[in-house]
UniProtKB/Swiss-Prot annotation:
Native source organism of the sequence: Homo sapiens
UniProt superkingdom: Eukaryota
Quaternary organization: Component of the small ribosomal subunit. Part of the small subunit (SSU) processome, composed of more than 70 proteins and the RNA chaperone small nucleolar RNA (snoRNA) U3.
Name of the featured protein: Small ribosomal subunit protein uS11
Ranges of biased composition (kind: Basic residues): 142-151
Length: 151
């Protein structure tokens, strides 16, 4: 009798997701943190910035809309990203921090600091921290009209 089809032994292949590096050497990625007053994005790419590795937002972590930009949601998002990076073999991150910018506020939102802290506490090595908020040399007219926003 011929052997059954379901009983054949399959060779297991070991799949390596990350680059081959020496022990103790850091593998860097770039973490783009965009912290507005409505949401916080934690987005990890490769060093060129073209290939997305992981992207999590504060809104993906909490139910209520008002909590999307909160420090707690940013912390949860950053922990998720750090865990995914470790699975893929990334051990260190350069940080690019961004606020809304343009003709709006140049101040990062409430989730920026806690996202950065959560990345550091989860065991990721931090390389460079850079502020990449778009600042215009001469902006378009801000919304609100001639007499401004009246409260």
């Amino acid at each position: 009798m011929a052997p059954r089809k379901g009983k054949e032994k399959k060779e297991e292949q070991v799949i390596s997701l990350g680059p081959q590096v020496a022990e103790g050497e850091n593998v860097f990625g770039v973490c783009h943190i965009f912290a507005s007053f409505n949401d916080t994005f934690v987005h990890v790419t490769d060093l060129s910035g073209k290939e997305t590795i992981c992207r999590v937002t504060g809104g993906m972590k909490v139910k209520a809309d008002r909590d999307e930009s909160s420090p707690y949601a940013a912390m949860l998002a950053a922990q998720d990203v750090a865990q995914r990076c470790k699975e893929l073999g990334i051990t260190a991150l350069h940080i690019k921090l961004r606020a809304t910018g343009g003709n709006r506020t140049k101040t990062p939102g409430p989730g920026a600091q806690s996202a950065l802290r959560a990345l550091a506490r989860s065991g990721m090595k931090i390389g460079r921290i850079e502020d990449v908020t778009p600042i215009p040399s001469d902006s378009t007219r801000r919304k609100g009209g001639r007499r401004g926003r009246r409260l």
